From Swiss-Prot:
Molecular functions (GO terms): 4 iron, 4 sulfur cluster binding; 4-hydroxy-3-methylbut-2-en-1-yl diphosphate synthase activity (ferredoxin); 4-hydroxy-3-methylbut-2-enyl-diphosphate synthase activity (flavodoxin); iron ion binding
Record carries keyword Metal-binding: yes
GO biological process, one term: isopentenyl diphosphate biosynthetic process, methylerythritol 4-phosphate pathway
EC class: oxidoreductase
Binding site for [4Fe-4S] cluster: C521, C524, C555, E562
Keywords: 4Fe-4S, Iron, Iron-sulfur, Isoprene biosynthesis, Metal-binding, Oxidoreductase
Record's keyword annotation contains Metal-binding: yes
Pathway: Isoprenoid biosynthesis; isopentenyl diphosphate biosynthesis via DXP pathway; isopentenyl diphosphate from 1-deoxy-D-xylulose 5-phosphate: step 5/6
Membership in a protein family: Belongs to the IspG family.
Cofactor: [4Fe-4S] cluster
Catalytic activity: (2E)-4-hydroxy-3-methylbut-2-enyl diphosphate + oxidized [flavodoxin] + H2O + 2 H(+) = 2-C-methyl-D-erythritol 2,4-cyclic diphosphate + reduced [flavodoxin]
Protein name as catalogued: 4-hydroxy-3-methylbut-2-en-1-yl diphosphate synthase (flavodoxin)
Amino acid sequence: MDLFNYFRRETSEVNIGAVPLGGPNPIRIQSMTNTSTMDTEACVEQAKRIVDAGGEYVRLTTQGVKEAENLMNINIGLRSQGYMVPLVADVHFNPKVADVAAQYAEKVRINPGNYVDAARTFKKLEYTDEEYAQEIQKIHDRFVPFLNICKENHTAIRIGVNHGSLSDRIMSRYGDTPEGMVESCMEFLRICVAEHFTDVVISIKASNTVVMVKTVRLLVAVMEQEGMSFPLHLGVTEAGDGEDGRIKSALGIGALLCDGLGDTIRVSLSEAPEAEIPVARKLVDYVLLRQDHPYIPGMEAPEFNYLSPSRRKTRAVRNIGGEHLPVVIADRMDGKTEVNPQFTPDYIYAGRTLPEQREEGVEYILDADVWEGEAGTWPAFNHAQLPLMGECSAELKFLFMPYMAQTDEVIACLKVHPEVVVISQSNHPNRLGEHRALVHQLMTEGLENPVVFFQHYAEDEAEDLQIKSAVDMGALIFDGLCDGIFLFNQGSLSHAVVDATAFGILQAGRTRTSKTEYISCPGCGRTLYDLEKTIARIKAATSHLKGLKIGIMGCIVNGPGEMADADYGYVGAGRGKISLYKGKVCVEKNIPEEEAVERLLEFIRNDRKELEL
């Protein structure tokens, strides 16, 4: 893979109805219904809305045999109205259901964590190598008949691994690790290869974007080692709703798409399924602007490890770099200095004029030729002002620098000026490639100056800024290269929206926390309560609790697992019933839905008496 130049990974083509995936085909977009699969009319109408919005596949939860059989009626209902969209059956826990679904759906998704292995109990199991091999044989014996049914019916499959539903067997041998998630997938892929079954799509998802990106990168490397080129389905599970869901999805999915990985995506929002499609389309279209871009002559630094990156070693300059959290620099060249206390930038770039009224606790950056050394202000130079920078005595200096301006003279200057923070700029179609190339050159030269990534936008819609900036910054954060971000928007959006987006990106990348985090699933036919209203009520009561993580899950398929690092959880337990969790431990079961939100808040109050609820 080329870190600096965009090329899509070459994958095998998979036939899914009349909409093939992988190979030379475009990146496909899909969603999943949240209606009961036994309600044919509701499923048909929702599937139509997904297709009308631009969805190319529709997935439906398939809990049992009767739901699997009803896929035929849903298919008939759609086709009778001219909707030829392929249907995907989503199967957990019961391989018999997958056998039936394969006769009626164009694709069947199975979960290796619960296909043959027992449901996860979070207990550590001990296996000898012989016993472990016997468990693999059990998978083979059950999986091969399913593959034969798929061959007979020309049905594709997705092997869909979820971080939240790894089996106890995998957890016991590999732990809760990317390696375990990859091996969970590879056990099934090796059987597919041995059985000459190639209509396979794979996915490895997590609500933790760091885990998701690292694991997909590792999976691709392992597949390449074993001569496999199956196409990838990308998604961030439990991404949430609103701004959080969009940023989190764009950050994780976008980081992989920008590296050419991914053949279909699903943006999992806790909103109406059809609302996911325009977000996914914007995400894909933005990434594809990189196609056929001018070549970037970057060189990978010897110490960089793409599969397991660590934070780049930098020298701390005041509160930037070293062990400090990534900073946020905000633009206020228009003289408007007001900030949201929850998202107060560390530095404000004021350009050529220092505002008369300044925000307390915020430091200001001025262009170097007008900087006069006033307390709480710092100079910013461009690459043509190196002599001026050498004459300046400030203990913190900023240097705006595009990759192509990184000359031997600039490198020599940085070697004698460790107090300089580089602000990496790019107007290249593949700005990720240029930002990476700049930092890798610094690393190769042994320079430890911190790097802040600057990106210019001209957006009038918050969603557009959220998607584009998260795509641009994602891989830089996951690569461990980011000491700060600077989003500069010349559209009509308020400074508050731009600032919140910057902080949201850092939180989604798990590098800096500025607000409550919600791990909420998009819901499906297994969700038997009003997910969107519940999320809104919980957010209204807890959004001020910075650093708290709350999981809001439709059902137990991924619930306890994906909430493993959440402080508290709210999980559907049946029609009208909710269970509450502290971490992954259930503390109350089968609470009536109408009482559950208040019971959750009451539990948090009693457990965290220092919090104001």
